[in-house]
Amino acid sequence: ILRQISSVGKSEFVPLMQKIYSEPIKESLILQRINDIKEKGGIAALSGTPQAAIKFKETLVNSKIDLFFLQGTVVSTMHIGMDGKETLNIKSLCQSLKVPVVAGNCVTYEVAELLMKAGVAGLMVGIGPGAACTSRGVLGIGIPQATAISDCSSARDDYFKATGRYVPIIGDGGIITGGDICKCLACGADAVMIGSPIAKSSSAPGYGFHWGM
């Protein structure tokens, strides 16, 4: 499948990926992959959108995952499901999973503070700066990464002073060089996520290509 995606032109890969990913997620396959990782002694980190967390909440609660990444273009403390009725309460999710929940993405002091108060163990920060991200062009939203990390790390520090609980900040987006990493750390990030350099490596499954949300 990855070879098929990487072989088509820029105007063709989105419809192709939509077709491929239209296949419903199989609940049994989620558990199977988690068990495969655990049997080999690995750390099972599961990633899902807020909508997926709503749909597969029971699977998450009953699985053997070590941590869960709640990932969306923009994440807040309450999300509405695909049916427009069922909601995901992040505080309840953090309490029910019994494993660390890392949430994102966010870019403001206010939202970072709300997510930390909800119980997340880590925050992913960044909307728009990624090489494969289309948020600024499609949605018209986004904040420069240095500003976003500075604001969210300020919320982290204030929250730590008030509660004694430290929530790491992960810079996510637009981080390609060692200089980019240093800038993020200087602005207050505890760690970074990188995509482009890894996607370009010889062992990457996408053959040098990568695709955004």
PLM features per residue range, with description:
Residues 99-101, 166-173:
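A short, small-residue-rich loop immediately preceding and capping a beta-strand
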Residues 1-163, 196-201:
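Active-site entrance/lid segments in N-terminal catalytic domains of soluble metabolic enzymes
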Residues 54, 109-113, 170-181:
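A glycine-rich phosphate-binding loop feature that marks nucleotide/adenosyl-phosphate handling sites
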